[in-house]
Amino acid sequence: MQKRHRIQFPKPGLSTTPQDEAYFYLQGSGGQRKIRFHDYDEIYQIQGLYEQIFYDRLKCSSPSKVASILESSVKQTDINFSELRILDLGAGNGMMGEELKKRGVSRLIGVDIIPEAYDATVRDRPGLYDAYYVEDFTKLSAEKKEEISSWQCDCMVTVAALGFGDIPTRAFIEAFNIIKEQGWVTFNIKDTFLNIGDETGFSKTIRELIFSKYLDVYHIERYRHRLSIEGEPLYYFAIAGRKNADVPPEFFDSKGIRI
């Protein structure tokens, strides 16, 4: 039976912390530890803690939602969903990979920037991925890029990892360009990041990509990603589309976006 951890959230009304700075307290024999939600290197080292916080307490639904819209989008074509070769960018400890495997996907390649994510996947979900790379996609060597490309992935997924500095824009575009033309691209993003008033580089990049010739959008849906620590719903967009071509650097230059 999975060990239950003693965790405590800040008292309601006392915390005005932004979503990317939210934190909790972990109670243990050595006392109380304050851990930020985005301190994944710490969270992954403690078996079951990630699942208990984000799925049991905060009711995260994103892996199932994103997998669902990917599957429904692919079914609009004559492609067999189970034959997709999927690159899971920001794979973490394998929650999204596990959801895809449940739906019959046979080929999964994981990527994350922190070794703790890989270690947690091997510990908790051994054998889930055909390969798992600990790599920074903003600094990917030609040799490593060729190795990852050799898997001939025709789909990229990324869940709950965009827009808060977890996966930089350049890394997202690098992964987009690695998958094959006519491949599938599925991700989720906080709803406010699609507001036209958000002028941050990441938001502008995603908006420009969605409405560009490089991606055909098949499905976009606003849904409840999870609850905040105050119990309020946090809404995201889930987006699924099909890649038409690699995105060249000059595309972003022409839009005044630095990646």
Where are these regions (language model features)?
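N-terminal auxiliary segments of SAM/dcSAM-dependent transferases
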Residues: M1-F37
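Class I SAM-dependent methyltransferase SAM/SAH-binding core
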Residues: L87, M95-K144
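A short SAM/SAH-binding and catalytic strip from SAM-dependent methyltransferases
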Residues: C153-P168
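A short glycine-rich, Lys/Arg-flanked "PGG" loop and its adjoining helix->strand segment in the class I
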Residues: R170-E181
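Conserved beta-strand signature within the Rossmann-like core of class I S-adenosyl-L-methionine
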Residues: Q182-K190
